[in-house]
Structure formats: structure tokens, C-alpha cells
Amino acid sequence: YQIMGLVDAIVRDPAFTADTAVRTRVRSPVEKLVGIQQAAGNGAPSPGAGRRGPAVVANVLRAADYLPFLPPNVGGFPQGSLLLGPHDLVSTFDLLATLDAPPPAMKSVDALLNRFSLFDVSSTTRHVLSAEHDAGRRFALAAMSPEFAVT
């Protein structure tokens, strides 16, 4: 199928990048997991590779009650603001524990934000990240930023 015309029309539409379309959807735990793995420079994990296997990832997602293809009830997975709250921070800590190794230190806050695909963060988020000098904690703070919680 030829879909480039459709894709082009979608991304050129002003509604695609309008303020009402940006950061209006809360990331699911699976989306956060993928984002954290990508930001750390990891590709898709190979089964049994590294010290953290699929069981660790499954346990983290089970604790968040968000195992793919196994919704908690017939209504499906929680969505929207139901994914936000103190449990979201705990879940993000658990997702960070799935990394096989500490993420590489970034040369700047902008480089770290680019790894997370965050390009328009608040001055508060930027200040918090700039004030932290430990690379691991800085990575964790970026993963827990309000901007990363939504997409």
C-alpha cells in the first residue's frame, strides 16, 4: 500500500502539533519501559541475555498490573489519569531496575533529554536535572519527569 501521502497529510496538519494534541495522553507502563530501554541505549532485549531476563520485566509489569494481553478485568487496562499517582513513581523505579547496566553518562542535560525524546521541558525539570551531578540519578529523574509521564 502507498501510505506516504496519508502520513504526509497527517504530519502537515496544524492539529498534529497543536497545544491541545501535545502531552494529552498518559504513557502506559509498557510505553515507559520501552522509552527507558531506548534512552539507556538498549535495543530489544534478547531472551536470556544480560543479568536481567524476561522474568524481571514480567514481574515489574505484573506489579504494575499491566501485563500485555492480560488486562486486569474485562474493561481492559486503566487509561488516562488513572495511570497517574504515587504508584506511577514506584512503577517507574521498578522499570528502571530492569536495566542490565547503568545508563551511559550524558555530556549534558540536553543530550539526556534527547535520549528520552523530550524537547520542550519545563524550567523546573531542566533545573532539577542540571542540579543533579550523579549520572544514574539524573537518568532516573528524567524517567520520572512529568514530561516523560505523558506523550
What are these regions (language model features)?
Residues Q2-T151:
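Flexible, low-complexity segments enriched for small/polar residues
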